[in-house]
């Protein structure tokens, strides 16, 4: 199956594309995109998956199809220095664009992202940015990976347990096994369970409470994950992330 994803990731994840769970996943995603009129004409969610084109879409699914693999496309396999694991894409209008915790420019910061920026300000003294778009982090080597890559509008968790988790597990596993000295940032119990197999002797694993307002004061604030990440990267001959 010829999946439209960044070439280095395509090579490393090729076995996944032929597995039964992934075929079932593509069938499910196709069923979630019934017919309507959406710009741009002729664009496909996954061209080679033979899924429905955008001009026939009626269901509202986030992120837009061209951004489903955005985390991989912006951060090639050999360029990954940091992995941050999220859970679901944002499910509100205009928010999700394929990077966990990130929102498009001009969109108000969701509460978790506000708390992330507060911790960066406290940890590094950096000002809170005007945009919540974290593409810059991805371009500097941060894989901002949600466990589930699509979601129905206003229905958190609606695409869980359909196959995305197995696919993103495979991506994390191949990184952990074939690369060294990556920083894995695991906020909250969900991310920590997903990253439980990572070899702590090969990589730095930073775990804390989630930045959600429900848990941020229980260990997220003050975790200094951003400075600790950069210290580790520099100690291993890599350039730091410009958080």
Where do the PLM segments sit?
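A polyanion-binding, active-site-adjacent surface
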Residues: 3-11, 15-186, 190-193, 198, ...
């Amino acid at each position: 199956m010829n999946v439209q994803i960044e070439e280095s990731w395509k090579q490393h994840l090729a076995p996944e594309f032929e597995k039964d769970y992934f075929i079932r996943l593509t069938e499910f995603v196709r069923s979630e995109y019934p017919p309507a009129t959406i710009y741009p004409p002729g664009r496909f969610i996954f061209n080679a998956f033979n899924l429905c084109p955008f001009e026939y879409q009626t269901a509202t699914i986030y992120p837009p199809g061209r951004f489903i693999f955005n985390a991989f496309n912006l951060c090639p396999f050999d360029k990954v220095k940091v992995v941050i694991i999220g859970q679901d894409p944002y499910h509100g209008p205009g928010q999700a664009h394929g990077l966990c915790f990130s929102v498009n420019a001009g969109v108000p910061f969701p509460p978790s992202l506000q708390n992330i920026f507060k911790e960066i300000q406290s940890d590094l003294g950096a000002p809170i940015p005007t945009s919540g778009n974290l593409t810059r982090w991805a371009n500097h080597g941060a894989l901002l990976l949600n466990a589930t890559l699509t979601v129905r509008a206003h229905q958190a968790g609606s695409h869980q347990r359909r196959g995305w988790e197995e696919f993103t597990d495979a991506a994390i596993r191949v990184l952990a096994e074939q690369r060294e000295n990556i920083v894995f940032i695991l906020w909250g119990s969900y991310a920590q369970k997903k990253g439980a197999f990572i070899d702590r002797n090969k990589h730095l694993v930073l775990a804390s409470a989630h930045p959600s307002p429900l848990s941020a004061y229980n260990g997220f604030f003050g975790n200094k994950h951003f400075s600790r990440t950069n210290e580790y990267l520099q100690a291993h001959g890599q350039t730091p992330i410009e958080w």
